[in-house]
Amino acid sequence: METEVEHTGLAIHPMDQFIVRKLFCHTESASPMNECTTNIHWYDITNVTMWMAIAVLVIAAILVLGTRRRAIVPSRSQSVAELLYGFIHNMVEEVTGHEGVKYFPYVMTLFLFVLCGNVLGLLPLSFTTTSHMAVTVPLALMVFVGVTALGFMRNGPGFLKMFWVTSAPLAIRPVLAVIEVISYFVRPVSHSIRLAGNMMAGHAVIKVIAGFASIAVVSPVVVGAVTAIYALELLVAVVQAYVFTILTCVYLRDAVGDAHH
């Protein structure tokens, strides 16, 4: 039976890095489509599970080390923790207003988790958890369901007024209302696909270009290109975490702020 690599003719397939594998698997098959990558159940510990756990441990380490010995003259770890705290706190307050600050802990947790998932994926032999819809969709759905529930809890049926554009002419308001409802329910789709798509695309490009490094004539150029793209991917990792978080704040503003357009 031909393996996936043999079928495509590539020595290293750029998408192999995104295959979910069980950590504890007994098989002698060298095929990428073996028992380790099939028949995965919800209780199996996979590479996704492991790297999400590592991300949580990294977040805990940053916050614990940064707040363990607080001083007027902050240490490096305290400076990092205070920088992250101040950055996210200001973002939440500026976007959602004073009423949204009470939800700052959730927003900061979300930002740190996405950021660590993105950055850890750049380490050699690691796994980018945020490149999988199985990770980004639940994150986006938690935001969507939470914001919707909060909106009805705070505003009651008045939360639905956000779909009725009062600034538009009366004749086209029903049409705009339908568009607003559709765009509202599309939020978790765009919220999750944006993050997963950007993280997957960048890593795939790096793998494709790195595949030419075995050609001696172009290897110096390839190494330089991979280094440049790698630096760009580090920036993308931070930017995508920021975009995911600020969109969460924008959606949160609909629930805690005025629901009228």
Curated annotation (Swiss-Prot):
Q: Does the keyword Ribosomal protein apply?
A: no
Task: List the disulfide bonds in this chain.
Answer: none
One GO term describing the cellular component:
plasma membrane
**Transmembrane annotation, as ranges:** 45-65, 107-127, 133-153, 162-182, 209-229, 232-252
Q: Which UniProt keywords apply?
A: ATP synthesis, Cell inner membrane, Cell membrane, CF(0), Hydrogen ion transport, Ion transport, Membrane, Transmembrane, Transmembrane helix, Transport
- UniProt feature coiled coil, ranges: none
Q: Name the Pfam families on file.
A: ATP-synt_A
Q: Where in the cell is it found?
A: Cell inner membrane
Xref: CDD domains: ATP-synt_Fo_a_6
Which GO terms fall under molecular function for this chain's record? Answer: proton-transporting ATP synthase activity, rotational mechanism
Main subcellular location of this protein, as a coarse class = membrane
Concerning InterPro entries, the annotation shows: ATP_synth_F0_asu, ATP_synth_F0_asu_AS, ATP_synth_F0_asu_bact/mt, F0_ATP_A_sf
Highest rank taxon of the organism: Bacteria
The way this protein sits in the membrane is described as: Multi-pass membrane protein
Q: How does it assemble?
A: F-type ATPases have 2 components, CF(1) - the catalytic core - and CF(0) - the membrane proton channel. CF(1) has five subunits: alpha(3), beta(3), gamma(1), delta(1), epsilon(1). CF(0) has four main subunits: a, b, b' and c.
Stated role: Key component of the proton channel; it plays a direct role in the translocation of protons across the membrane.
Family to which the UniProt record says this protein belongs: Belongs to the ATPase A chain family.
| Protein name in the entry | ATP synthase subunit a
Task: State the organism named in the record.
Answer: Cereibacter sphaeroides (strain ATCC 17025 / ATH 2.4.3)
